[in-house]
Amino acid sequence: MRLHSVLAVATAVGCAVAHDPVVQVPMCPWNAVINFDKTVPDQKPFPQTTIRLCYNSKTLSLKFEAKDEKYFYFDPSQKINDDIWKYEVMEAFISTGHADPSTYLEFEVSPNNVTYQAFVYNPSKNRTDGAPFDHAFISNPIADGITSKTSLAQTQGKWTSNVQIPLALFNVDTPQGSKWRMNFFRTVTSKETYPDQILGAWNSPDKASFHITSFFRKIVFV
């Protein structure tokens, strides 16, 4: 363990199990570190991806690092809450409590710092065909306190995004000791392969869908 870092390395194993350890996220400036490098769902090699998490009294801080990046592929015409997920993004799915959620925040950021943020209504908890599945978009994220600062290091094959998400979105007034379910994802595509994507996840679902909430991992703020 190095200064300001609590290691929480988690290479996805293809299925969530009940005895998965609860990941502890500390107050800033310390952070928990999550890594993944396997595809969804077949667990083949995937570009190394890191997320660093910490919190303060008002905010969840996420630092996304997309490593081994070759393409930096995005649509420059897209704006807030457009379908940036069709290109290259890093994603966080977040809910409070330790039960499998039926509603949760879906946050995405692209290499050109465009964001997508919506509360997802998914009562089947696995996006079952024919079941309700809807999004309530956050239309003015910056005014609401959702911010991102993204930088590209193309010679190093990496892009990084520092994200702040207000805890008030989740009605959390006392964050220390609060319980959460989260999962983190990344999509990879290129001009040559679009619209096909390679998918990666912290805790990989058993099929190519990010919206299976039993695979969200348990987290507690300490």
From Swiss-Prot:
Arranged from A to Z, the UniProt key words for this protein are:
Glycoprotein, Secreted, Signal
Domain of life the protein comes from: Eukaryota
Question: Which interval of the chain is the signal sequence?
Answer: 1-18
> Where found?
Secreted
Gene Ontology annotations for the cellular component aspect, listed alphabetically: extracellular region
* Glycosylation site positions: 113, 126
> What name does UniProt use for this protein?
Extracellular protein ARB_03106
Which species expresses this protein natively?
Arthroderma benhamiae (strain ATCC MYA-4681 / CBS 112371)
Q: What is the lineage of its organism?
A: Eukaryota, Fungi, Dikarya, Ascomycota, Pezizomycotina
